[in-house]
Amino acid sequence: MARSRVPAAASPAKLGPLLSRRFFARSVHEVAPELIGATLLVAGVGGLIVEVEAYHHTDPAAHSYGGETPRNRVMFGPPGFAYVYRSYGIHWCVNFVCEAEGSASAVLIRALAPTHGLGVMRKHRGLDDERSLCSGPGKLTQALGITIAHNGAPLDIEPFAIHRRTVEPDIGTGPRIGISKAIELPWRYGLRRSRLVSKPFK
């Protein structure tokens, strides 16, 4: 099958079927690349997922590596729920819990190509530059209005809606960003040639 490149920024198009929680009940390394090109909406605002990172419970960089705590409890729950935490005490990050309950594995959503509700995103972010609206995990949560109130929310019930991708993207892999452990693991997945990813893929 010929690959079609998902654009770095796109206009609203026909959405694919909604993903159910069962989609996430698989290896985090299967789920993560399949999220590239999917559309994430929160209360109708969002865009195409262009960059993610996988975190497994055996991974020293994962929040769950040291065991269950009040902060990471959602990671230890069933798949298909949002795990939201504050990074460096500054901004929120949103993850999708994967694998069987107790596995404590998740996919961090790093970047989106805005497609829906750009006016709302611009208001939330206080800027007009479309490229800067969702080009980072903290930026996209601010743009979509994601906060700790969304922690533990099911991903297949409003305000969340995740639509399966409708084209096969050209996916790149590489080391994850901003971590100090397991830095050699190529567990970052993203849309190759996108200008919105944290670091270009080779």
UniProtKB/Swiss-Prot annotation:
The keyword Hydrolase applies. GO terms for biological process: base-excision repair. SUPFAM superfamilies: FMT C-terminal domain-like. It is an enzyme of class 3 (hydrolase). GO terms for molecular function: alkylbase DNA N-glycosylase activity; DNA binding. Its EC number is 3.2.2.-. Keywords: DNA damage, DNA repair, Hydrolase. Pfam families: Pur_DNA_glyco. It comes from the Bacteria. InterPro entries: Formyl_transferase-like_C_sf, MPG, MPG_sf. Coiled coil: none annotated. NCBIfam families: 3mg, PRK00802.1-3. Belongs to the DNA glycosylase MPG family. This is Putative 3-methyladenine DNA glycosylase. It comes from Rhodopseudomonas palustris (strain BisB5). The lineage of its organism: Bacteria, Pseudomonadati, Pseudomonadota, Alphaproteobacteria, Hyphomicrobiales.
